[in-house]
Amino acid sequence: GITEVKKISDMAHAYDVGIQVHCAGSPLTTNAALHLECTLPNFLIHEHHTCNRMDTSVGLTKYNLQPENGYFTVPDLPGIGNEFLQEAIDRATLYKVIE
């Protein structure tokens, strides 16, 4: 989780090692990664995967963060600054894991 990555990053910083958060998921992971990266003095680069530009990803959340001129604007909204759209939740496939 976010707290564990922060701990690992702090240890890496003590040894002058840079950090790049692997972020190849949904728009929510982009928000979480951006907020985390803002706290890391040893942050190097943000990974923005092409899956975050696909229609299936763009339609998942209220806000669609994309870089502009190579930079992101980190939202100052509550939490990680984004939320799933109810329509995306309604069309999600449900799986029953345990009887």
What are these regions, as identified by a protein language model?
Residues 59-99:
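C-terminal extensions of enzymes
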Residues 1-71, 75:
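Shared catalytic-loop signature of beta/alpha-barrel
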